[in-house]
């Protein structure tokens, strides 16, 4: 037994996920690591970011749309504010492309 945790920071976890993705196994890894509630919370966070980046709804409207508390929306908004405009554009582009890719798969 070692005296410390094998994974001690976020970058190590990101490397683990990247390695799994290279093998095409990121989905089972994340499914194993996260409880259903954690996965649901992550889906909510992705939707929060998507709605905030679109900028069409108020935080209260997003809260009602997604069924999450206003404080949850505020935390997402505060996190977004800590990123550059370039990062926000990249994320919005990724979110839009991912949605379109999913729709294309459903049509097939």
Swiss-Prot record:
GO terms of biological process kind: negative regulation of DNA-templated transcription
Protein name in the entry: Trp operon repressor homolog
Any one Pfam family match given in the protein's UniProt record, by short name: Trp_repressor
Functional summary from the UniProt entry: This protein is an aporepressor. When complexed with L-tryptophan it binds the operator region of the trp operon and prevents the initiation of transcription.
Chief location: cytoplasm
HAMAP family (UniProt xref): Trp_repressor
InterPro entries assigned to the protein according to its UniProt record, in alphabetical order: Trp_repress, Trp_repress_bac, Trp_repressor/repl_initiator, TrpR-like_sf
Residue stretches spanning the membrane: none
Protein keywords: Cytoplasm, DNA-binding, Repressor, Transcription, Transcription regulation
Family the UniProt entry places it in: Belongs to the TrpR family.
A cellular component annotation (GO) from this entry: cytoplasm
Gene3D superfamilies with a match to the protein in the record: TrpR-like
GO MF, any single term: sequence-specific DNA binding
Native species: Aliivibrio fischeri (strain ATCC 700601 / ES114) (Vibrio fischeri)
Oligomer status and interactors: Homodimer.
């Amino acid at each position: 037994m070692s005296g410390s945790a094998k994974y001690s920071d976020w970058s190590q976890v990101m490397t683990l996920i990247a390695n799994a993705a290279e093998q095409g196994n990121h989905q089972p890894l994340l499914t194993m690591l996260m409880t259903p509630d954690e996965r649901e919370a992550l889906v909510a966070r992705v939707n929060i970011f998507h709605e905030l980046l679109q900028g069409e709804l108020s935080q209260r409207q997003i809260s009602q749309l997604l069924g999450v508390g206003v404080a949850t929306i505020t935390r997402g908004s505060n996190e977004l504010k800590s990123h550059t405009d370039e990062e926000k554009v990249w994320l919005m582009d990724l979110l839009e492309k991912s949605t379109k890719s999913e729709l294309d798969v459903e049509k097939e």
